[in-house]
Structures are given as structure tokens and as C-alpha cells.
Amino acid sequence: MLSQVATPDECLRCGACCAHFRVSFYWAEAELMEEHLVEPLTPVYSCMRGTNQPEPRCQALTGEIGKEVGCSIYAVRSSTCREVQIADEQCNKARLAHQLIPLIQVSPADSENDHDYDQVS
């Protein structure tokens, strides 16, 4: 399967996770969020408005998926949003659903030349 190396700013171009999953969280996390962006699910859980439907898209998501996006509540986003990490399973599942190439994470140690091999000069 084709994949690409994740860059630090990849999330600013993607946004697929914000338009693929229901973003539910413990109700108290919503206290710092704008009220119109949150809807109750159960007595103890809430979700981001726009994500509890067949074709979810978080109302806090701005921009165009795969081009340039942002989160209007990034500083106070839920723990659910914070858990999704670039190039993890959830990230790539959402990217594939939006016809975006999956990402791979390359650690700096893995990307350095292997000392067992001759370097091309």
C-alpha cells in the first residue's frame, strides 16, 4: 500500500479525523467549549456537534479536508481529539475514508544512515 512520511504540519492539511469519527467525551470537558459546538449524548457523555451523524464533520473544523484545515477550539479540544496522533491507526483509517494517502511515522533514529553500510559521497 502506498504511504507517505508524516510531516509535523500534516494535520493542518488533513482534517480527516474531524470528519470521520463521532467525537464523544465526558460532559465536563465541554465546559470550556462554545455551547453551540457541543451536544449531549447521555447523562455523562457529550459529543462535538456535527459528528453524531452518518457523514460526520465536526462543527469546530474549518477549511477543506486534505487541503488546509484548522480547529476553532484547538486549545480546549476534547481528550478524544488529543488522543488521535499523526500516522496512528485512527488517523490513517480516517485518511483512507477521505481518499488520502496513509501516513507513516519515521523516528529520527530510523532516518539516519546505518553505519553498517558505506555512504555515497
Curated annotation (Swiss-Prot):
What keywords would UniProt list here? Electron transport, Iron, Iron-sulfur, Metal-binding, Transport
Quote one Gene Ontology molecular function term: metal ion binding
- Give the record's family classification: To E.coli YkgJ.
The protein's name: Putative ferredoxin
Provenance organism = Acinetobacter calcoaceticus
